[in-house]
Amino acid sequence: MNGTEGINFYVPMSNKTGVVRSPFEYPQYYLAEPWKYRLVCCYIFFLISTGLPINLLTLLVTFKHKKLRQPLNYILVNLAVADLFMACFGFTVTFYTAWNGYFVFGPVGCAVEGFFATLGGQVALWSLVVLAIERYIVVCKPMGNFRFSATHAMMGIAFTWVMAFSCAAPPLFGWSRYMPEGMQCSCGPDYYTHNPDYHNESYVLYMFVIHFIIPVVVIFFSYGRLICKVREAAAQQQESATTQKAEKEVTRMVILMVLGFMLAWTPYAVVAFWIFTNKGADFTATLMAVPAFFSKSSSLYNPIIYVLMNKQFRNCMITTICCGKNPFGDEDVSSTVSQSKTEVSSVSSSQVSPA
């Protein structure tokens, strides 16, 4: 084995030289130079100082502007709450531990941090899945003239939390466990060891299939069908300038949504699965640290893609920040664009974009 396994940790370095120490007791500067830990601190501080205000502003403008409190926007509020969850309970801890060079809060603190970080990340992940399903139902109408209500929206939100708990809670009760990962200053599920007491193999397979593969399939299917629907409607209207603009806007938004999701979760899932299937293989601390930080960065670009790129949300935010005035003019576009002359207007960008 090319790593060192302790009672509740796994350090990706052999202890033949005797330098490996518990990540709960000593700085881990033998894994990476101190400046790399400071770089992590700077990165986490950037995420906190940018993601926290944007997500708080999302909640504020939704509360202040009644026109934003529509059932199709509930999941965006849930996404903002999940991102705030990650920032408050995950990023702040990582910042402090990275500054010290090791996980100073001990095994119990590691389990708590790992749980909250996983919970927030999973709520955000499943919010994107529910968002894709909602857009598919509203635009593609697989159930006919289905009326999407507040009850359906709340059911979708409840589903995200149930799925998140089903992923984050098991390691607290003996199905896998949380331990320091990467540079040993943040915690995640145990992908590294064969310990039969924790049944890590079955948990990792469960997590990979249920909490990554299935969301990817659902998102690709939902947004793929949505784009096809928009193009069909545009073709029926003989590619007028309006329908072409709507088609391009919808396609661009969908591509950004899918790329954002894949950028956040694919690197982490792939590296974690590689470590899981190659236990004992040689890998550096940064191999797991970098993908983990990719997933954390979703708390910043999620609101950018799903909120700030939406005209209605963006204009309401500008109005709120500027004390009731919009210095850029009134370009508010309601998410309930009038459905009158053409079929494509029923699948316009304002309906399939995240508002």
From Swiss-Prot:
Q: Which residues are glycosylated?
A: N2, N15
Family to which this protein belongs: Belongs to the G-protein coupled receptor 1 family. Opsin subfamily.
- Membrane topology category: Multi-pass membrane protein
The superkingdom listed in its UniProt entry is: Eukaryota
What processing steps or modifications follow its translation? Phosphorylated on some or all of the serine and threonine residues present in the C-terminal region.
Instruction: Report where it is expressed, by tissue.
Output: The color pigments are found in the cone photoreceptor cells.
* Residue positions, PTM N6-(retinylidene)lysine: K296
Q: Name one GO molecular function term.
A: G protein-coupled photoreceptor activity
Q: Which UniProt keywords apply?
A: Chromophore, Disulfide bond, G-protein coupled receptor, Glycoprotein, Membrane, Phosphoprotein, Photoreceptor protein, Receptor, Retinal protein, Sensory transduction, Transducer, Transmembrane, Transmembrane helix, Vision
In its keyword annotation, does this UniProt entry include Ligase?
Answer: no
Q: What is this protein identified as?
A: Green-sensitive opsin
The task this protein performs is described as: Visual pigments are the light-absorbing molecules that mediate vision. They consist of an apoprotein, opsin, covalently linked to cis-retinal.
Cysteines paired by S-S bonds: C110-C187
Residue intervals annotated with topology Extracellular: 1-36, 100-113, 177-202, 277-284
GO BP annotations, alphabetical order: absorption of visible light; cellular response to light stimulus; G protein-coupled receptor signaling pathway; light absorption; phototransduction; visual perception
Question: What are the transmembrane regions?
Answer: 37-61, 74-99, 114-133, 153-176, 203-230, 253-276, 285-309
Q: Which residues lie on this side of the membrane: Cytoplasmic?
A: 62-73, 134-152, 231-252, 310-355
